[in-house]
Amino acid sequence: MKQHNKMKFTDGSRIFFTSDTHLGHTNIIKYCNRPFSSVEEHDETIIKNWNEKVGPDDIIFHLGDFAFGSEKQWMNYLDRLNGKKYLVIGNHDWRNLTPGVCQRFVEVSQQMNINIEGIHIWLNHFPFLCFSGAWKGLDASWQLFGHVHTSPYADSGLDHQRLVNLFTTQFDVGTDNNNFTPISFNEVKEKINVQMMSLGMHRN
């Protein structure tokens, strides 16, 4: 792991985000009401969806809780997935951050601070109550996160009641919240614009 410096991207059209894939985690199907009959079906669906959307040269930020299992299993998953992969460490990831795993990511960090097309974005595993730039109106920073397993179809998380307090520029990029598929920067931008419009704000 290395200290993260802010990355700037002038074109966000091939940048993607995801979180909480929990590959190899049998019990996540029950815990989060995921619509799969086995962990094999779960894993293969997530891998298929990822590779259909993310190309080999695209950039994807994974915001933590990538997989369960051994170092070998992690490396096998990573070798099957498209894209230049960045990992923001989740609470379940620490035990598997071996040299063999880390070298399969462009970068591994507890937090990332990026800028895409002039938008400042904090990337964390957990949602924050406040973050730098949150109060700047139309020029507000974003915070993208995972961990809470938001679902548009079911209340599957203990944090459901607290999530009403999020800023309009925060969004859960977790796989439960996005049809078990990575979400693009442009799709996140559309979601955040809708949230901002609910307060009479809009960003082009």
Show where each model-derived region lies:
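Conserved beta-sheet core of the metallophosphoesterase superfamily
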Residues: 103-203
